[in-house]
Amino acid sequence: MAELQEVQITEEKPLLPGQTPEAAKEAELAARILLDQGQTHSVETPYGSVTFTVYGTPKPKRPAILTYHDVGLNYKSCFQPLFQFEDMQEIIQNFVRVHVDAPGMEEGAPVFPLGYQYPSLDQLADMIPCVLQYLNFSTIIGVGVGAGAYILARYALNHPDTVEGLVLINIDPNAKGWMDWAAHKLTGLTSSIPEMILGHLFSQEELSGNSELIQKYRNIITHAPNLDNIELYWNSYNNRRDLNFERGGDITLRCPVMLVVGDQAPHEDAVVECNSKLDPTQTSFLKMADSGGQPQLTQPGKLTEAFKYFLQGMGYMASSCMTRLSRSRTASLTSAASVDGNRSRSRTLSQSSESGTLSSGPPGHTMEVSC
């Protein structure tokens, strides 16, 4: 038998000529993220079943990022533009993500039977421990929008030791007053449920402009096969209790918080009021110009930038690279840090619309983004 010989084959034309190892690593990461479709689970709770989707693998000594969406949306329609944004990939490779869908909001969800008692927002918050127990996760960083922001804030009040930080977009911590109820009832006589929800999600200026984004979400909500379920979630949101935040009082969020709202957004006044009631040493307030009612959809780059600095202020991603947004400017970053255990807990963001300089300022500072 002839002796086998080893033959070496060299590639005459590399597939990616001139590609650096760093670029190859980034391309591999992007492909891995693209192929990661997440694992969807359901767990029974005292208030019914809840569905959630997990992306990535748990990282030692790091919390999970847990999201909760607003009324009329699910986790994909609420958060995909943000978490698929290019600069966000540096964050999500460092944290496992849990995207919770409110009951009946997940894709393909059956319509609840007539007379079904939908959970209150407080009860939806009480479902989260069942999710974390199922996954064996001990702590989270919560990211919520609208009703989801309220739910995560309520959860943080009930379980402060399990929440390391909160990003609350468009939160309204107040129960509806009599005037709100009267306006809501009057609107209900002349507007459909989809139109009322769109008015909750977007500003009147956006709705009048009828951009492609508005057309897309109007179509999603109007033709949702689970519209009856959406109405139940909407009713629970409108029946929410007051969170009773009080600056300097016993009822407050005890973790770092970043409040986010768009300039002229439907919930701008509510978020401003919420900011006035929280601990200024723990709270950052990000008001985003030209972002409308859903900044995570319209300005994912700017929100990613702020989120990255928020995580750095908590002691994570200290070696994080600057994003394109900050590289395009003269950027300076300083920290005023107070140590809680081994972790820096006190950093707040500010941005000057005139100088375009990013910096960290004293706690309780407002960050207005108009770029």
UniProtKB/Swiss-Prot annotation:
Phosphoserine: modified positions? 326, 328, 332, 335, 338, 344, 350, 352-353, 355, 370
Primary site of residence: cytoplasm
Q: Where is the composition biased (Low complexity)?
A: 347-361
Stated family: Belongs to the NDRG family.
Q: Which gene encodes it?
A: NDRG2
Q: Which Gene3D superfamilies match?
A: alpha/beta hydrolase
Tissue expression pattern: Highly expressed in brain, heart, skeletal muscle and salivary gland, and moderately in kidney and liver. Expressed in dendritic cells, but not in other blood cells. Expression levels are low in pancreatic and liver cancer tissues; absent in meningioma. Expressed in low-grade gliomas but present at low levels in glioblastoma. Isoform 1 and isoform 2 are present in brain neurons and up-regulated in Alzheimer disease (at protein level).
- What cellular component GO annotations does this protein have? cytoplasm; cytosol; extracellular exosome; Golgi apparatus; growth cone; nucleus; perinuclear region of cytoplasm
| Pfam families hit by this protein | Ndr (PF03096)
PTM N-acetylalanine: list the residues. Answer: 2
Query: Which protein is depicted?
Result: Protein NDRG2
